[in-house]
Every structure is written in structure tokens, then in C-alpha cells.
Amino acid sequence: MRIVFRVLMIAAVFAVVSARPAVAQGDAEKGKAVYAAQKCTGCHAIAGAGNKNIPLDGVGKKLSAAEIRAWIITPKEMETKTKSTKKPPMPDRYSKLPAADLDALVAYLATL
């Protein structure tokens, strides 16, 4: 029963992810502020600033906005799906970001 519930929850998350706009126009500047406020540089780097172990340079060219969003809100599922071995693993606390902040963060990362 727990497995069925988990599968349904994952399906629901992907339904929500695909139903949202891929990138909220004009939110990239706010997304840059969200990136800083959430202290993403503890694990990630952009243009050499931050933790260089997991650089995000070019992430917007490598991943769609929906994939970026999925990495933020369902990192464990994305790690499994992509067989990622990056350490430390992405924490799952960002799924609780307010929708406007999440949209802005995705918009910012999509510009990289």
C-alpha cells in the first residue's frame, strides 16, 4: 500500500510540474535573490563563485525548465532517474519553497 501511495504522489508531483509554466518571464532577477537567500552556494557554484564541486554553469542549456524544477522539488527521484552519483545529494527541503520563489529560481537557473 505504501508503494502505491508513493507512486501516486510522484505521479501527482510530475503532473503539477508539467502543468506549470516552464519559465516565469521576468522572474530571473528575483530568482537570483532566491538562490542567494537559500544559500545555494554552499553546494553549487556559478561562474566560479560558491562550492565548485557542483557547478551550475550552463544548466539552462543542459536541462529544460521542467527538469530544473524536478531537481529542486523531487531531488531523490531525479537522482534515481538519472543515476546521479553527485555528493552530497540534493536536499529535499526546497519542495517547500513558496510557488513564486520556486518559479523565480527556475527562471534564473534556466538563464545560465
Question: Can you say where each PLM-predicted feature lies in the sequence?
Answer:
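Electrostatic cytochrome c docking/interface patches
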Residues: 16-36
